[in-house]
C-alpha cells in the first residue's frame, strides 16, 4: 500500500523539484540592471532584475513628476499655482496634495506644504533669503497653514494669493513610488529604487537576501560627502525615507540654522533630534512623516507612532552631554542588520 502511494506521489515530487530548479536557475540567469541619473536636484540609483533596461521609461516618469511638483521648474504645475495662474492639476499633483493634506491633519500641521514662504525666507527654498526679522516671520505666519488651501474640482483654491506651495518634503518619496509602480507593472519582482535617500524595495537583492539600506551618521555634511553609517536595516517590500538637519544648513553670527522649519513658529526647529528615518508602506508617506518627526521632536513623534502602528521610526538624537543616542520603534529591532 505504501509502495503504491509512493509511486503515485513520485510524478508530483518530480514536478516540484524541476519547478524549484527552474525558478532558482531563472533567478541566477536574469541579470540585475543598474541605472543612475539626476532628478529633483539630486542623484537617483535604481537596481532591478530584468533582461531589459527601462531607464528611458523611468526617466520619462520622473520628468512627469518634475513637471507636476517641482517648484524649481518654472513651467511646472506647482510653479504656476504659486504664480496664481488658473491651472487644472494633474493626477500626480492631486495624489500628492491629498496625501499631504491628510498627513498635515494627522500631525496637527507639523507637515505643511504651504510652508514655502518661510522656507524661502530662511534661504532653504526656491527663492533666496537669509535669517529674517521677527516682523517678517509674523507676517508670513498669516499666509502659512494647510487649511488655507484646498482642492476644488481639480483646481487649487487659496485664501490668500501670497500663499505658496512646496512639495519638496514629499516629492522625492513620491518619485520613488512612481518608479516602483512602473517596475511592478513590468512584472519585475526584485528591485530597489533610491532617489536622494528615499527608498522603495521589493523582493531580494542580487545576493538573494533582503535589501540592506544604510542610515547615515548625522554629521554636519553640507557637501554631502559623509558615507559613515549609523546602522543598516533589512528593508524588503517597504519604503524608507530619512530627514535630517546635518546637510542643508548655514551659520550666521555663530548660530546654526537648519532647513527644517516649524510651520507654527516660522523658525528652524531647535530640538535634539538630528535624524529621522521612517519605514512605511509607500515612500511618499515615509518622506512626509520623516519631515514631520523632525518638527515634532521626540515626544510628539512617539504620540504619532502610537496612532500609526504601521509606521516604524529610527531616531538619532543628541543627549544632554552632546553625545549621539538612538531611539527606535520596538518592532524595528527585528530588521536591524547591525
Predicted segments, located by residue:
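Mature catalytic core of soluble alpha/beta enzymes
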Residues: 2-338
Amino acid at each position: 500500500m505504501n509502495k503504491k502511494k509512493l509511486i503515485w506521489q513520485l510524478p508530483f515530487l518530480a514536478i516540484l523539484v524541476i519547478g524549484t530548479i527552474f525558478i532558482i536557475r531563472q533567478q541566477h540567469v536574469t541579470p540585475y540592471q543598474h541605472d543612475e541619473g539626476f532628478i529633483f536636484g539630486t542623484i537617483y540609483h535604481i537596481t532591478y532584475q530584468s533582461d531589459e533596461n527601462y531607464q528611458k521609461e523611468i526617466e520619462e516618469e520622473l520628468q512627469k513628476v518634475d513637471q507636476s511638483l517641482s517648484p524649481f521648474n518654472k513651467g511646472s504645475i506647482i510653479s504656476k499655482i504659486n504664480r496664481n495662474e488658473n491651472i487644472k492639476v494633474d493626477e500626480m499633483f492631486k495624489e500628492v496634495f491629498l496625501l499631504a493634506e491628510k498627513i498635515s491633519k494627522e500631525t496637527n500641521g507639523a507637515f505643511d506644504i504651504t510652508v514655502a514662504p518661510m522656507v524661502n525666507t530662511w534661504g532653504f527654498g526656491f527663492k533666496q533669503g537669509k535669517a529674517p526679522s521677527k516682523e517678517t516671520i509674523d507676517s508670513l505666519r498669516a499666509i502659512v497653514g494647510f487649511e488655507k488651501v484646498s482642492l476644488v474640482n481639480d483646481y487649487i483654491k487659496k485664501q490668500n494669493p501670497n500663499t505658496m506651495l512646496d512639495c519638496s518634503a514629499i516629492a522625492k518619496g513620491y518619485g520613488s513610488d512612481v518608479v516602483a509602480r512602473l517596475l511592478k507593472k513590468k512584472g519585475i519582482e526584485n528591485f530597489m529604487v533610491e532617489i536622494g535617500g528615499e527608498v522603495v524595495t521589493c523582493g531580494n537583492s542580487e545576493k538573494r537576501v533582503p535589501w540592506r539600506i544604510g542610515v547615515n551618521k548625522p554629521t554636519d555634511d553640507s557637501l554631502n560627502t559623509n558615507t559613515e553609517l549609523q546602522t543598516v536595516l533589512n528593508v524588503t517590500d517597504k519604503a524608507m525615507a530619512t530627514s535630517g538637519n546635518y546637510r542643508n544648513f548655514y551659520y550666521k553670527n555663530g548660530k546654526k540654522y537648519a532647513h527644517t522649519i516649524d510651520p507654527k513658529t516660522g523658525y528652524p526647529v531647535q530640538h535634539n533630534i538630528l535624524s529621522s528615518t521612517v519605514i512605511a508602506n509607500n515612500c511618499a508617506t515615509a518622506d512626509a512623516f520623516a519631515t514631520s518627526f523632525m518638527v515634532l521632536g521626540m515626544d510628539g513623534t512617539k504620540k504619532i507612532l502610537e496612532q500609526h502602528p504601521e509606521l516604524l521610526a529610527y531616531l538619532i538624537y543628541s543627549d544632554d552631554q552632546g553625545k549621539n543616542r538612538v531611539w527606535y520603534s520596538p518592532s524595528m529591532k527585528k530588521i536591524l542588520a547591525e
